[in-house]
């Protein structure tokens, strides 16, 4: 059984319902991020979900928030004991079953209006653009790169943060500077590449290549960067199997590429009202579990 939408009967105000997360306000300084089992591809949410996906995303985000805590402030307050911070009624089974294991209690910060993407390898949309123009996000890239090849150094490639139902738009660093200012854009790019590099090095030791990832940042009262949202999950990243990695082709991945491929091959990419087959949902869940277990070293129960 999958949870594709939460319902807390207005005990907490619903702030937003995103592609995956339902966000509730606990108080003026605190939010509850509930990762549901919804899954989207090509900016469309599937009609059915993937069992335990929300819990897998949440537990993996918690792992990475702890891993990156020495390097940056994060918005995470609590995962395991959220009910101590919530109205007592939410401990009742009908609510607890929706929240347990899939919720992050987080501090509220002013959001930076950018999707902060770091690419270590050329793949996906970056590869498509490079083949046509030899550029990545408007910047001239090295000549002769092959699909899935590692960049000499990771690159910061921002995009706009679109509203629900709209498409994120890849932009240049100069366009990002126009949105948030040069000083903040420079800082974000530097910090994001550093965080990616720390995670990439760790993952390599676990047999996983982090090809690229998306970070989101907030600002605290002192205008210092804070890592927010989810972090380094199969929804926000491309994870590849290092054992089967081979330059010059697409890679075995532990992310939504499996679903994207199925939609494309069936002529369903970008169409509303699509339900995954049980087989696709099950096989997608296996990918999420494999990523969790490989990266954390823990068995998923």
UniProtKB/Swiss-Prot annotation:
Keywords: ATP-binding, Ligase, Nucleotide-binding, Purine biosynthesis
GO cellular component, one term: cytoplasm
Reactions catalysed according to its record: 5-amino-1-(5-phospho-D-ribosyl)imidazole-4-carboxylate + L-aspartate + ATP = (2S)-2-[5-amino-1-(5-phospho-beta-D-ribosyl)imidazole-4-carboxamido]succinate + ADP + phosphate + 2 H(+)
EC number: 6.3.2.6
InterPro entries registered for this protein in UniProt: SAICAR_synt/ADE2_N, SAICAR_synth, SAICAR_synthetase_CS
CDD domains noted in UniProt: SAICAR_synt_Sc
Pathway: Purine metabolism; IMP biosynthesis via de novo pathway; 5-amino-1-(5-phospho-D-ribosyl)imidazole-4-carboxamide from 5-amino-1-(5-phospho-D-ribosyl)imidazole-4-carboxylate: step 1/2
A GO molecular-function annotation: phosphoribosylaminoimidazolesuccinocarboxamide synthase activity
Source taxon at top rank: Eukaryota
GO biological process: 'de novo' IMP biosynthetic process
UniProt record similarity statement: Belongs to the SAICAR synthetase family.
UniProt xrefs under PANTHER family: PHOSPHORIBOSYLAMINOIMIDAZOLE-SUCCINOCARBOXAMIDE SYNTHASE
Protein name: Phosphoribosylaminoimidazole-succinocarboxamide synthase
Natural source organism: Cyberlindnera jadinii
Lineage, opening ranks: Eukaryota, Fungi, Dikarya, Ascomycota, Saccharomycotina
The gene coding this protein: ADE1
